């Protein structure tokens, strides 16, 4: 390591003596403006270095640099356990977290694309009347002058304004006009002096057209004439309450002008930014208030099996003796409706007819049926029936587009904002690039179009072309959220910063990883230091500098085992190097299992699936692969998991497919193991989840000193009163409310963070109290309990070590676990139960998340162990090492979004490697 005197802080960041968590007082030199990968086995200390040390110190220094007034709102940030960091720049962390749980947040709002779209439509959008399709314009003084200029020379014009009058008080009106200096009126096309009308005692009749004459002139190219003309037109608009007219006195032709924004008898709203905002009451749909969804009748609940026709009882609510009368009535009265056609094959118009009917309240449509139920809510059976079919549904007014109807009348080159936010991003970009605009509009929109297109290009580069602008943020996966954040950062073009990313390749097919690397290099090339915590081999190869933390996890890690480029890493003696060079490898299984029984999915159509049939082998390791957005999760989660849950009687919502068949004897349970947190309580931890803590509490309650004090197992729990600290209620920390500032968390002064009362801590087992046990890592605890022959506890904790989580502390809060760690804790809990459980189908969503090659080896061993116990395992995965170990691969594709949703391949990894159509083939061939 270079001495501190040699460090050039313009070119390097120097981390001195980092000792947070398991980091062993390490010094790290990081080159600036480079792409740096921090790698190492799970739990070796990568995140402690990248996020908890470098990023945390960058944040702290930024906050310290603010005024004391600004700092009071931000709370004090703790200094990380590091002596010093020299050359540190402002730091930005982009982590694997879903951006927002706010139902109003969308891909468009979080990337700012929608903000620019709103501006674009407000600035250059043209409003068209829904009646005639003509453009709505309002006239200005200049428009009237331009019309006069465009006419032939010396044409005599009469400028008039319509007169609003009351027949009874017409004389008073004439008097007021005379006092204002006006002298003439035009009555039914004929000129008359105001004084003449007064002297005749003229009384108008109903329906007469009377205009006030403002001016008479012929056009002259003269400055003073133009000034007079402008004043006259201004006055005409004022007197006519926004209307005026020019009459050619030679030909009698009249041209009407209005400075109101109206056409076809409709007064339109003038577009502005708020008009297109669904977060503003002015622009939001009045029915759903901008959410896009309402609590209403759920189509999926009313028609659970879309493969049936109306005649075959597709409508679940029209079954039974009484309600089936509605079905019979509909069949009798429906004109030209295909009653034998499956629901999913009906056109939009035919579905509308079934739901809305012919518009009459007597027609037996579905909407009228539910209206009848609502009108009879005093009957309990109708209330129950109605609740059965209610759910969150698309808003019937805006159809999920969130905006008021009038916004759809504003268009740019024939496109309204609704149609653009519905398009997949890979279709929206070419549409934006091909807009035909006038030179004037081009000048206005130039910057806006640049911001929109660059952001869209970045989103496409990180493999998100299948998303739409309108997609809500809380429906995205962690990987998608992170890549959206990444694209947003690139769009902001911030330079001179340190970007720290947490495994951006998660959820990406190897093909998309190549594009991601390009994006990371772009971020580096504009003048940033990009630090990536990553296990992906391709990202490592592309890095300028690699830092390997190890050698193992937990207390066996935390050391800097290598720092240098990829070429030098190959010669190093580290686990990463050994796997990269093939000195250690994940071996291909000697033989693949041949399945005898299958799950048969027929006619899967949800989202982008193209009516596909899929056969999935049981009692095997099956991998579902395909590029990001091809339809893997839809097939596995929305169709397979939901249907099996329905058939097993444990809930689930029916998707759009014909049928799912499986042998009941081989699937008694189904478990979807995704990356959602395992517990929301801050007291939830891995040992409570695995039920090992029950045995540990039992053990302590049996100690001699515990019996003397009358302690039961509950005294060693931090979830109930008894032995836990009364001040912090077993949390170990106390949250202090700071009113207008962020709450501060302080260590509890009573128990000093141990969570228990002092007298409970006096109970010891082999010199360790309950707090000491909770602070042990899984590896340390296993050694400790093995020595003491506590086999029951060892049996429950061993699976945590098997899935590569030996570095976790027993009492570590579940809220601090990453998505990948939470998923592996769930896997460990099934390995504990696996021996006794009935045959189960396990569906894993990317279990390799956050795993080093060495940990993947352990994961595969655990998955194979489940299959050996007679269970079935399906894995949605992109990691080539897991794919090559599968008994069967089903590749969905060929592309993402509407270009995907087909079965490209099904068979063994060897056969896939030879397949020409699959994007996966090339990457698996390299591994076999």
Regions found by a protein language model. Give the residues of each.
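Conserved phosphate-binding elements of NTP-dependent enzyme cores
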Residues: 1-928
